[in-house]
Amino acid sequence: MIQRYFRRKLAGLALLLLIAGLVLFFTSHLDDFDFDNAVAKELTFTSQGNRLSGTLLLPGNGHPAAVAVIIHGDGPQDRYSDNGYNPLFNTLLDAGIAVFSWDKAGIGNSQGNWLHQSMDDRAEEAVAALTLLQSLYQNTPVQIGFLGFSQAGWVIPAAAAQSQPDFSVIIGGAVNWRDQGQFYQGLRYAQQGKSPGDIKQLLAAEQAENDRIFGRNGSKDPAQRSDMTPDRFEFVVKNYLSDATPAIPQMNGRVLAVWGAEDLNVDARQNSCRYQSLLKDNPKTKVIVFPQAGH
């Protein structure tokens, strides 16, 4: 009886300790998602006839050393990427770097439809955002540039070639749209246990079919891809031939291109080598592949 009593007491104590530990773990990271020490300013700008709404987050003292203009990856992202950006933004703010991010076209308070945009459209939008920030910090030492992820790899090079950012940071970007699709699908087939020979044949067949629909002389017939919504089909039609190769050597400002060696979306080895080759004449370039890191 006494042993049973103590076992119940110990079990209850263990449960309380577990709950307390979980509460401590989760609440200790809540500050990563709050901007209590930041100064927030709502800003709007116009691109391609769309009014776009965003937020400029400033360090608590209101005087940043730099401003990072955020370029989203794929998907219907708001200015905070459904709060997924918040820990990163707080890290930048703690380092004295302000952040400007806006709702994608048609998301949140922004007009338009992001699925109707080409990568060139997105680059034009990025330049408009950069120009707005540069006007706010004219005749100051504040450094202003781009910071983007994944699909931003097709946006930032074009934007940086058309404007004068102080820096560009590209994380997990691909150079060629078709090559990225082949890499991504090839890994999926490998995970399914298909042989290298089968994968090669499947990828060749898919490439030919995609070229027939989305290529330069493709049919552009949405009926041939019933798995896509009309908007998504239009997005792929506009971007299927995207290739950052011509723009990368023309980028202005310092360039930092970063990949994770274990990226399952983008071929880190191939794309980092391409950046090194294309930017070999730019002394203000750094290309890094982090081991044991993903997309």
Stretches with model-predicted labels:
Residues 29-62:
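N-terminal cap/lid segment of alpha/beta-hydrolase-fold proteins
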Residues 64-73:
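Short beta-strand element of the alpha/beta-hydrolase
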Residues 77-88, 104, 269:
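The serine-hydrolase catalytic nucleophile loop
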Residues 89-109:
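Conserved alpha/beta-hydrolase
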Residues 116-137:
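Alpha/beta-hydrolase active-site loop
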Residues 169-250:
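Accessory cap/linker subdomain of secreted extracellular hydrolases
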Residues 251, 257-259:
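Short beta-strand/loop motif that positions the catalytic acidic residue
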Residues 253, 267-278:
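Short alpha-helix in the alpha/beta-hydrolase fold that links the catalytic acid
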